[in-house]
Regions:
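N- or domain-start disorder-to-order transition segments that initiate the globular core
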Residues: 1-41
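Glycine-rich phosphate/diphosphate-binding loops that line cofactor/substrate pockets in enzymes
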Residues: 37-45, 251-256
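Conserved phosphate/anionic-ligand binding catalytic regions in large, soluble enzymes, centered on
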Residues: 48-61, 323
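Conserved, mostly hydrophobic/aromatic
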Residues: 52, 261, 327
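Short acidic, Gly/Ser-rich segments with clustered Asp/Glu that frequently serve as metal-coordination loops
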Residues: 54-57, 256, 264-270
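Active-site-facing alpha/beta catalytic cores
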Residues: 66, 79-244, 265-270, 274-281, ...
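Internal helix-turn-beta structural module
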Residues: 304-342
Length: 342
């Protein structure tokens, strides 16, 4: 038998009973969700900035980072909505390496999913409690949605997951914003088909239940660059790429046309410092075109306290143990620069 069953994990309801979201934080999340909805539906002219570590590996340093973000948020909240990236599951290109706090609450120890589910939820709740900022996370495993459905305000569907039917159908049951990334091939039609699927109702099997969903009108596109057949990275954040996406949106029956630009990954050729220039180019493109100003609703930026990255166990506080990130000083300056464009 290929599967070795280690232990049965608590259900989402059991975990949420153990670590509930306090009533005052429920209200904060409702307000944040409504703010983000207004941006994606065009009722608000604010701009989304989804920013934070590549992976949320340590509760103290992540919450330290989000507290810094909250102080900046006070200065820019009339123009921007800052959404901290608290990514607790990490897709790995080869399946090897650190897979996030949900798998390994201690990156230097073996996986412990029970402790990981508790650590993940505790970190998200602490961040909201201390800052009032609800976060974004990536949905790597659709069956885990119940563990975080009451605490997240934004969900990303990654380039390797966006073609998967269960991801698409699960998003159709969300009531929060969901960004569907272009696949690694860069095919816009695949991404838009994913948005179409997520925006429509479905019947399917989910965690042992027959379920119906009603569609998620906040599903939208995320451009993260592509990889060609030779393994070279190809950006797709340029003006002409955005115009092409707008034209394709116009031909499809989709609600709330919206796009967020991921400034890292293949768009930056994995050169994290390029995120600064890329973000500014995107903001400039929005100024040049009324259509793009309507379409591009936000950016994603990988950022932490210390710039770059380190190996697991190296011990530098606030430095990524996965992909390299912008440091805090550059990140803070970039947020203020984004606000100046608005």
């Amino acid at each position: 038998m290929s599967f070795e069953f280690i232990k049965k994990l608590p259900t989402p309801a059991e975990i949420r009973k153990e670590l509930p979201l306090p009533a005052e934080l429920v209200k904060i999340k409702e307000e944040r969700d409504a703010e983000i909805r207004d941006v994606l539906t065009g009722k608000s002219n604010k701009f989304l900035v989804i920013i934070g570590p590549c992976s949320a590996d340590n509760e103290d340093s992540v919450c330290d980072y989000v507290n810094r973000l909250a102080r900046v948020n006070e200065q820019v909240k009339d123009k921007l909505i800052l959404i901290p990236r608290i990514y607790t599951n990490k897709p790995r290109t080869t399946g090897e390496g650190y897979k996030g706090i949900t798998s390994q609450p201690d990156p230097e120890k073996k996986p412990d999913f029970l402790a990981g589910l508790m650590a993940m939820r505790k970190m998200h709740i602490r961040a909201i409690q201390e800052t009032g900022l609800t976060a974004a996370d990536e949905m790597l495993y659709p069956e885990n949605w119940g563990y975080v459905s009451d605490i997240l305000s934004y969900v990303a569907i990654g380039a390797r997951s966006v073609e998967d039917q269960q991801h698409r159908l699960t998003v159709s049951g969300f009531d929060v914003a969901a960004g569907m990334k272009n696949p690694t091939s860069g095919d816009f039609s695949v991404m838009l088909n994913s948005v179409y699927a997520a925006q429509h109702p479905h019947s399917f099997i989910y965690t042992g239940w027959e379920v119906n969903t009603h569609g998620n009108d906040l599903a939208h596109t995320v451009l993260r660059g592509a990889t060609n057949k030779h393994g070279a990275n190809i950006p797709n954040y340029h003006y002409e790429d955005l115009i092409r996406l707008w034209d394709m949106y116009e031909k499809m029956d989709l609600k709330n046309p919206a796009c967020v630009i991921d400034a890292n990954h293949s768009n930056s050729n994995k050169q994290f410092k390029e995120q600064i220039r890329i973000t500014k180019e995107v903001m400039h493109s929005r100024k040049l075109s009324h259509d793009l100003h309507k379409l591009v609703k936000g950016v994603m930026i990988e950022s932490y306290i210390e710039e770059g990255n380190q190996k697991v166990g190296a011990g530098c506080y606030g430095k990524s143990i996965t992909d390299p990130c912008l440091g805090w000083e550059d990140s803070e300056r970039l947020i203020y620069d984004i606000a100046e464009y608005e």
